[in-house]
Amino acid sequence: MVSVTEIITYGREAIERIICKYFKDSKIEKILFLPSEEDVKAKYIIGRVGFIRISNTWSGIVVVDGVQIPFVAEVHLNGKIDIYLYPQKDFYLAHLVGELNG
């Protein structure tokens, strides 16, 4: 059986890989998961249908060429990952949307 820590680690690493691939031609300065202050134990939200967990939702920012771009990412148990970028919105919107999706 897969532990919660392994699922969380897989989600973070997969999100980072996808973001790096998306911005491959730009300079990524950092990928920060919320809440932060460089917190390694970033908050994620578990999506449920009844008692069945269907996804983890993460929010954060990616700093690309000095620009902060908020994102929300859903990691589904079937391995599918959806990442939504909010380049026109401010930093805190991504966190709010992440909270509302929980």
UniProtKB/Swiss-Prot annotation:
Please provide an example of a Pfam family that matches this protein in its UniProt record. Answer: DUF5461
Q: What does this protein do?
A: Essential for virus function.
What is this protein's name?
A: Uncharacterized protein C-102b
From what organism does this protein derive? Answer: Sulfolobus spindle-shape virus 1
